[in-house]
């Protein structure tokens, strides 16, 4: 009885093994094709920052810069609202040079106009090259609907 069970198991393994190998090969081919197609599509990333925390602000600048440096054709946008606005104000930012450098590299900084109104900030107070959007949250949602990757920066 044991011998028949073992024999049956071996026969099943011999019969099923080629099919399993074929499945693995097909999966590997699909993964390789997926990787190749991912490499041909430019990265599109939107960062969401609301914090005045220095660590969070350093992180968004570092991460946006690293993505842009690694993928020069990437579309990178940083959306600022809430308490994060000091990062892009001419007279308050401790990172003005970094922001300008990233803008020069093609990173887009967009400030929520609702937040600007709430904090009594005018466009003339923004670092050169920083733009505005009517609503920061709507901007992020729009980018996500277009297939952009989303990264929330938290302290």
List each model region and its residues.
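Positively charged n-region of N-terminal signal peptides that target proteins for export
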Residues: 1-4
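Bacterial N-terminal signal peptides
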Residues: 9-22
């Amino acid at each position: 009885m044991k011998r028949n069970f073992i024999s049956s198991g071996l026969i099943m393994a011999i019969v099923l093994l080629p099919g399993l190998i074929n499945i693995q090969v097909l999966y590997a081919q699909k993964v390789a094709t997926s990787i190749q197609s991912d490499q041909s599509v430019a990265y599109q990333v939107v960062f969401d920052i609301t914090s005045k925390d220095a660590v969070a602000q350093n992180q968004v600048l570092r991460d946006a810069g690293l993505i842009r440096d690694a993928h020069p054709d990437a579309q990178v946008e940083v959306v600022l609202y809430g308490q994060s606005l000091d990062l892009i104000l001419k007279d308050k930012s401790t990172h003005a040079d970094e922001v300008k450098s990233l803008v020069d590299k093609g990173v887009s900084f967009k400030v929520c106009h609702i937040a600007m109104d709430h904090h009594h900030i005018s466009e003339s107070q923004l670092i050169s090259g920083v733009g505005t959007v009517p609503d920061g949250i709507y901007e992020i949602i729009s980018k996500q609907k277009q297939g952009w990757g989303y990264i929330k920066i938290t302290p």
